[in-house]
């Protein structure tokens, strides 16, 4: 193992992604209980630790793949700056502490959810990536859980329509988001022999499937104003416009990949903000 720096550790835990996971957890908690408590903060910290631990373990599992993909080749394990043993120990330590904090925040139910997320992401999704082009469906199921973790940790009802809609939004957003990102490194993925739909399906079939996912994502967004989830008419109009923007992005998904990706990501952020503002009942003079 070469010299390990703080920057290497940050790259190992993918701190930006882990921070976004923590933010999604905090968002879910605020939707359930719209005022900050220690439980909100503990649940967010727990998912940050879990995400960082999952990332470290994932990079150990996929070190050979990371080495042949330009975007990931500079990660510390493929470069030899962090060894497999050190990466594994750090990942397990972060996951274990994350589980402890999550149990402290939300009790046994939250702990079991946290264990399930790690089991699905590192135990199922990561190995399946080498075997099937639709492994992302498994990964997305785990990736959509952070808002659920936050919601449940603060005592939100598990069968709430709001929770179902938010989980569905996160789930459906991940598919086009990842596929559009993967198009940037298609030749590297081909070299790594990963069976992505972009590579394993005929172009026309892949394009149709990508549009289907965009349309499904748009329908999920349009469900928000269709059901009584928002109090303010202005907020319903804004979310409806977001759904229309996704339908537009579906038409651009193949020809204007970057534009479609930005729209997909921006819509998720916009809907999160709208839901939170509506839940907090923040006065906005425009509406």
Swiss-Prot record:
Q: Write out the transmembrane intervals.
A: 19-39, 100-120, 134-154, 162-182, 212-232, 233-253, 267-287
The organism's superkingdom is given as Bacteria
Topology class, membrane: Multi-pass membrane protein
GO MF term list: protoheme IX farnesyltransferase activity
Q: Which Pfam families match?
A: UbiA
Please give the GO cellular component terms listed in this UniProt entry.
plasma membrane
InterPro entries assigned to the protein according to its UniProt record, in alphabetical order:
Protohaem_IX_farnesylTrfase, UbiA_prenyltransferase, UbiA_sf
Is Transmembrane helix among the key words of this record? Answer: yes
Keyword Transmembrane helix part of the UniProt annotation:
yes
Q: Which reaction does it catalyse?
A: heme b + (2E,6E)-farnesyl diphosphate + H2O = Fe(II)-heme o + diphosphate
List the pathway annotation. Porphyrin-containing compound metabolism; heme O biosynthesis; heme O from protoheme: step 1/1
UniProt subcellular location: Cell inner membrane
Q: Which GO terms describe its biological process?
A: heme O biosynthetic process
What keywords were assigned to this record?
Cell inner membrane, Cell membrane, Heme biosynthesis, Membrane, Transferase, Transmembrane, Transmembrane helix
The role this protein plays is:
Converts heme B (protoheme IX) to heme O by substitution of the vinyl group on carbon 2 of heme B porphyrin ring with a hydroxyethyl farnesyl side group.
Q: Which family does it belong to?
A: Belongs to the UbiA prenyltransferase family. Protoheme IX farnesyltransferase subfamily.
In the UniProt entry for this protein, what further remark is given in the free-text comments?
Carbon 2 of the heme B porphyrin ring is defined according to the Fischer nomenclature.
The protein here is known as: Protoheme IX farnesyltransferase
Q: What is the lineage of its organism?
A: Bacteria, Pseudomonadati, Thermodesulfobacteriota, Desulfovibrionia, Desulfovibrionales
Gene that this sequence comes from: ctaB
């Amino acid at each position: 193992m070469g010299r390990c720096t703080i920057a290497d550790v940050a790259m190992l835990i993918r701190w930006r992604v882990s921070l976004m996971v923590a933010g999604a957890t905090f968002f879910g908690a605020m939707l359930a209980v719209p005022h900050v408590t220690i439980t909100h903060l503990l649940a967010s910290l727990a998912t940050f630790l879990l995400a960082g631990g999952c990332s470290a373990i994932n990079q150990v599992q996929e070190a050979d793949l990371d080495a042949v993909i330009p975007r990931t080749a500079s990660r510390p394990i493929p470069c030899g700056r962090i060894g497999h043993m050190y990466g594994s120990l750090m990942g397990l330590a972060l996951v274990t502490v994350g589980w402890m904090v999550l149990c402290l925040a939300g009790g046994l139910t939250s702990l079991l959810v946290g264990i399930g997320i790690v089991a699905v992401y590192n135990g199922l999704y990561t190995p399946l990536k080498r075997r099937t082009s639709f492994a992302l469906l498994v990964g997305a199921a785990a990736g959509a859980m952070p808002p659920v973790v936050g919601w449940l940790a603060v005592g939100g009802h598990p069968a709430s329509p709001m929770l179902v809609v938010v989980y569905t939004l996160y789930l459906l957003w991940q598919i086009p988001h990842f596929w559009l990102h993967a198009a940037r490194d298609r030749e590297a993925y081909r070299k790594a022999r990963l069976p992505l739909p972009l590579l394993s399906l005929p172009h026309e079939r892949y394009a149709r499937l990508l549009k289907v996912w965009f349309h499904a994502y748009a329908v999920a967004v349009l469900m928000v104003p269709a059901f009584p989830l928002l109090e303010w008419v202005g907020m319903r109009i804004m979310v409806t416009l977001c759904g229309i923007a996704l339908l537009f992005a579906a038409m651009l998904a193949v020809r204007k990949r970057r534009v479609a990706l930005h729209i997909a990501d921006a819509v998720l952020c916009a809907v999160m903000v709208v839901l939170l503002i509506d839940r907090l009942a923040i006065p906005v003079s425009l509406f």
